[in-house]
Structures are given as structure tokens and as C-alpha cells.
From Swiss-Prot:
One MF annotation (Gene Ontology) recorded for this entry: nucleic acid binding
Lineage: Bacteria, Pseudomonadati, Pseudomonadota, Gammaproteobacteria, Alteromonadales
Record-linked InterPro entries: Restrct_endonuc-II-like, tRNA_endonuc-like_dom_sf, UPF0102_YraN-like
SUPFAM superfamilies linked: Restriction endonuclease-like
Entry's family note: Belongs to the UPF0102 family.
Organism: Shewanella sp. (strain MR-4)
Protein's UniProt name: UPF0102 protein Shewmr4_3685
Coiled coil: none
């Protein structure tokens, strides 16, 4: 298992402990990828997982570029359309740094 996969598993477990329900993982399209798809009450939650062993380069949260946010949004829109879902959604980030988990709800 790669470090990225380990981080995603850790994030998934953490979010489940917080009351979210797992739906799908690593949804890939030619134009973007979604790390985790979860449900929280009536919202579908598209989660980007960022891992850094140290924050010497600005940390995990700062590693998310505008271009990457655009690709995640496009992938989420495509997912909702292909699954015929007309539901409220949000975009969260789970940042894992130095064995600490930071959950940013509605991050972008």
C-alpha cells in the first residue's frame, strides 16, 4: 500500500468516526480524480486527501492548487450527472501532517 493509499484509508476511517458514510474511493476521470466520496446527512461530500510528512514546504493544505480544485469540481460534477444525483454537495479537505489529521469542512 502506498503512502497516498494509507493516507486515504486513515482519512476515511477518521471521517467515518465523525459520522460520515463511505460511498466510493479513487473515482478517476480523464480530467480529474476524487479521493473519497462520502455522505454526511443529506450532503454528498467530495474529499481531497493531502498528506505531508512535514510542513516544510507549506503543509498539506497549501499543496492544493487552483487548477487541482478545478479538476476536482469538474470530476464531482461529472459524477453527479452520471449517477443522476440532484443533491446538495460540498468539498472537504483532509490534511494529514506529522500524524495529525485536520478536517476542513466546505474547504472550497
Amino acid at each position: 500500500m502506498t503512502l497516498g493509499q494509507q493516507a486515504e484509508s486513515l482519512a476515511q476511517g477518521y471521517l467515518e468516526q465523525q459520522g460520515l458514510t463511505f460511498v466510493e474511493r479513487n473515482v478517476r476521470y480523464p480530467f480529474g480524480e476524487i479521493d473519497l466520496i462520502m455522505r454526511h446527512k443529506h450532503h454528498w461530500v467530495f474529499v481531497e486527501v493531502k498528506y505531508r510528512s512535514a510542513n516544510q514546504f507549506g503543509g498539506a493544505i497549501q499543496a492544493l492548487s487552483k487548477a487541482q480544485i478545478g479538476r476536482i469540481r469538474m470530476a464531482a460534477s461529472h459524477y453527479l450527472q452520471t449517477h443522476k444525483l440532484d443533491v446538495p454537495c460540498r468539498f472537504d479537505v483532509v490534511a494529514i501532517e506529522d500524524a495529525q489529521i485536520h478536517w476542513l469542512v466546505d474547504a472550497f
